[in-house]
A protein has these predicted regions:
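Bacterial N-terminal signal peptides that target proteins for export
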Residues: 1-8
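Hydrophobic h-region of N-terminal signal peptides that target proteins for export
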Residues: 10-21
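Alpha-helix termination/capping residues and helix-transition junctions
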Residues: 14, 24, 53, 139-142
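Intrinsic low-complexity/disordered segments
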Residues: 18, 28-30, 185
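An N-terminally biased module of ancient metal coordination in phosphate/nucleic-acid-related enzymes
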Residues: 22-100
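Short, solvent-exposed loop/turn segments at secondary-structure junctions
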Residues: 36, 193-195
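Active-site gating/metal-coordination segments in enzymes
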Residues: 74-193
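Flexible, glycine-rich surface segments
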Residues: 197-199
């Protein structure tokens, strides 16, 4: 019995003094917004640099489908969407910003990005026509749709208009269009409230 204990103790000692080898992990990011809620960004070169430093080889990239309003009654510009009670509104130009940034890249860098169209109002039955126009403007650029905001709690409370639902008529039309173009759709839908402590 003493021999077994001595062997185990020796094994533990070997394990603890053996140098740990760092692994060369590489990652894919499945959810990255290129812009903030004011549709501003640090730019594509900063993003590529951060990806390189973090070993991120591929990224799903989208804009943000809403923009934060700076209300005339607020003396200072809010720093974030939750900075005050001013509304956010649907903002379709977010996709133009993403597309323009991707076009700055050379072909090898561009292959690292998987852009999703997000700049549409998911309550509007015109959304599918808008998405089709965007797909036609840049054939082959867009690889998916989303992130589509449905219930996003504090953002939902600030969004002008009706709260989107994943099963509304407008999004059903978007799903059919996505199927036609063989595009995945990414939805954001919280299941509990951030404002209240119960589901």
């Amino acid at each position: 019995m003493l021999n077994i204990r001595n062997c185990l103790a020796a094994l533990c000692l070997v394990v603890t003094v053996t140098p740990v080898q760092a692994r060369d992990y590489h990652y894919s990011d499945s959810h990255l917004h290129f812009v903030d809620f004011f549709q501003e960004t640090d730019g594509m070169q900063q993003l590529v640099k951060a990806m390189d430093e973090s070993n991120i080889d591929h990224v799903m990239i989208s804009g943000i489908p809403v923009a934060k309003k700076w209300h005339e009654n607020e003396p200072k510009r809010p720093r974030y969407y939750a900075g005050d009670d001013a509304a956010v509104y649907w903002y379709s130009a977010t996709d133009v910003l993403v597309a323009a940034a991707l076009k700055e890249l050379d072909e090898d860098q561009r292959k690292r990005f998987h852009p999703f169209l997000s700049g549409f109002n998911p309550n509007d039955k015109n959304a599918d026509a808008h998405i089709r126009r965007m797909l036609d403007l840049d054939p082959g650029l867009w690889q998916g749709l989303g992130e589509v905001f449905t219930r996003h709690d504090d953002i939902t409370a600030l969004t002008q208009g009706d709260t989107p639902r994943a099963n509304n008529e407008a999004l059903t039309r978007v799903y059919h269009l996505a199927a036609e173009f063989d595009l995945p759709v990414m939805l954001h839908s919280n299941i509990t409230s951030k404002r209240e402590r119960n589901p």
